[in-house]
Amino acid sequence: MKSAKVKTNMQQFYKNVVSVPAHWKESCVGTECSLHQLSPYIGKLKSSIARDLVATYSKPGDLIVDPFSGSGTVALEALLQGRRAFTSDISAYAKILCEAKLKSPPSLECALEKAENTLSQSNKLPDPDLRKVPAWVRQFFHPRTLKDAIKFATVCKRDENNFLFACFLGILHHQRPGFLSYPSSHLVPYLRKKKYPRDQFPELYQYRELRSRLLSKIRRAYARCPKIPTNGNSVHKHCSVRSLNLPESFDCLITSPPYMNALDYNRDNRLRLWFINPNYSVTTEDKVIQKQEAFKITIASLVKKVNSSLKTNGYCVIIVGERIASKPKTHLSHFVCNIVADYAPSLKLLEVMEDHIPDIRRSRRDYRGTKKEHFLIFHKV
């Protein structure tokens, strides 16, 4: 891209920047639909922000697309507000979370009954040979707990019960007693041996029963859970954006591409990913979050499809994580705006909202990568 064009677009970009609404900075943990809390997902969009975006840029009955769906936050908020949702993600973990939230059992009683049946079936399976389990996985669990966990995950996958699987993944590791692992962090799996030495806290390294913890997790999932219309209102595709076929016509796109070079989704979800697929390799990485050129190619592929399928007067909201340390000419928001200008001429930049991310919202408090987000609001004319 020519530097003059980039400079011009940057000047226009900053003319459109406004601060996000003040209430976006408030916590929503105690008020959001509790299905949002099935299992942690690094870099996820706050549900209160997704709720506002859905309400502002769509109307009931609209079809909302999120091609980088992550944990399904946008899609769940869409269904809660009477919209339809079309989502996709290349991550197997994202697929489980999306389908768990969008196709959850209709009631707590139904969910508990399914859990009891699945637990009963898993108990009938032969114990796995832990010698075949990688040492880095074994170090997180009491051997009996690990055997129970592997058998339960096996039945969930066999029966394609993603709701129970997501609840299970949500209690896989933490330092609290309601979780299955030895003391460890919740979002990213690291053992906390220094803070909780085995010789000083032997009770934290004992067998942890699965059933009671799973049922408690399910009850928490339904603590604030209005009835969600699920019949035919949501579709999820497990694929990359480049291979994705968008609906022929849709009303709104709201998405947050992965934070390029700022988060390592595979490494940070490695323990959950192992239970999803024991043959999973930690070294496997979606190139979209590694290489700037791959990121730009992927965004270009997406906006071409949006240009063709987004309805006239529809909105396209792209949320981009920025790195303060980067030079202005390399800010991802500027790349995205230029790509949209080149490949989606029908999309006009309406507004840019800027949100500075406080340390309390970071998965790693000492991390100096993504410091703010830009909400790029495009309108199809």
Regions from the PLM with identified roles:
Residues 1-60:
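S-adenosyl-L-methionine
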Residues 50, 62-81, 85-92, 98, ...:
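Conserved proline-anchored active-site loop of SAM-dependent methyltransferases
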Residues 63, 314-317:
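Short glycine-centered segments of the SAM/dcSAM-binding site in methyltransferase folds
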Residues 92-160, 277-286:
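Conserved phosphoryl-transfer catalytic core
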Residues 146-255, 260-261:
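SAM-dependent nucleic-acid methyltransferase catalytic core
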Residues 259-301, 324:
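Mobile active-site "lid"/loop adjacent to the S-adenosyl-L-methionine
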Residues 296-312:
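A short glycine-rich, Lys/Arg-flanked "PGG" loop and its adjoining helix->strand segment in the class I
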Residues 333, 337, 344-381:
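Class I S-adenosyl-L-methionine
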